[in-house]
Amino acid sequence: ESVGPDDCVAEILKHGTLSMGFIGLAECLKALIGEHHGESEKAQKLGLEIVGYMRQRMDEKSAQTGLNFTLLATPAEGLSGRFVKIDQQVYGKIPGVTDRDYYTNSFHVPVYYPIAAAKKIQIEGPYHNLTNAGHISYVEMDGDPSHNLKAFEAIIRCMHDSGIGYGSVNHPVDRDPICGYNGIIDNVCPRCGRTEAEHHQRIIIPRMNCCD
């Protein structure tokens, strides 16, 4: 608060973090070897080498400068779409690389790739240890996790055992547009008793249930 407009800010930087983030590891691997890390062990090994090198560079800069350089697994929802549009203008639509509306966030296995939850967790887990400025991994459940607590617990334990530092389980939540009920609706709304056969469609609202 006492810093003037012409004062040096070098000392202030020592109290913060200088993070480098990245997106699109999956597309990078597709461009380099034709497979992403969800598709082969070879791609996973290369992915860990790439992210490991970025972390090494951050550690080296920290040692050289005494500043807190860190590596961030960026959840860049807006940037992932903006960057791919820029690259499409330059390189066109390259299959598996720039042919979608977005790049995959950070080190994530692409959301369009069919993969078991446990396998996705095991692939992404090692990257959490490399990204010391922040990271998150998601998996999705088909329905209400309270109806299958064993599966939910198995996912959480798998995250723990795989080194996931910050994990999230996504599941669908329905909204009845007539009575406004929010929750899991099977065939009958728990609040008003209305069924989908009454010519009103329910609206699906995604909700995220975060688990440390």
Predicted regions and their residues:
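Long, C-terminal-biased catalytic regions of enzyme "large/alpha" subunits
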Residues: 1-212
